[in-house]
């Protein structure tokens, strides 16, 4: 008999769903409990490692350790020890499959959707294998629950009403890498190549001048900085084009200003055409950065 209906793995710090079982239950009551689970996932950091919320037909159980939590929607006939044994098994399987770095860097929902096959396998095992075959594991969990009972949540703790959770506006935590940019264009690739070339020229001239100045005099510090500052600005322009960054316009203007001022300062060491080339590449890169927009957010993969 099926007593575990749905399971998912989420990141504790922001409630980002990492993987979930593909469910085939679409009753109104079940969908309501899915919404409750999603609401609760956003606030797991507020609760201890284990907790349960029970209703008439369904119950939610969660178990977390570190930055990974496993959550399940079960029938009310499902013993708590079995639910937490299932969640602990799932937690071990997930953390054995993915390291903490991958989990921490995940930026989109269901980044580890392929783990669904493991969830289904473990879920089937707990739903259809007799409890006598899991006696050892269940006894261990039962002892732990006696020593440290799980937090008991009310249905109000999982409610979502008009987009407000318990009278508080939900925080939508979304790390910067979660922003996905539009595909790179041919002109954008050209601007990257030219920018890297300008950065290399600035670095080579700056290092060469620094070596010469150390042997001769310390009067060339201004010229050295005028080469190295635009070098850093060119590299940062490449970063701004490839990745999203907050306050992008302000950073673009600042980098463009550094490059223009640096090249104007080098008027005695570069001819007019060289200066115009460097400034022209900087303007092209700035234009490409500002015209490359964010992609529209994708839906939650239909899980």
Swiss-Prot record:
The chain crosses the membrane at residues 184-204, 224-244, 249-269, 271-291. The keyword Chaperone does not apply. Residues 205-223, 270 are lumenal. InterPro entries: Longin-like_dom_sf, Longin_dom, Sec22a/c. SUPFAM superfamilies: SNARE-like. Signal peptide: none annotated. It is found in: Endoplasmic reticulum membrane. Residues 8-119 form the Longin domain. It holds the Pfam family Longin. Keywords: Endoplasmic reticulum, ER-Golgi transport, Membrane, Protein transport, Transmembrane, Transmembrane helix, Transport. Disulfide bonds: none annotated. It is a multi-pass membrane protein. Residues 1-183, 245-248, 292-303 are cytoplasmic. Belongs to the synaptobrevin family. This is Vesicle-trafficking protein SEC22c. It comes from Homo sapiens. The lineage of its organism: Eukaryota, Metazoa, Chordata, Craniata, Vertebrata. The gene is SEC22C.
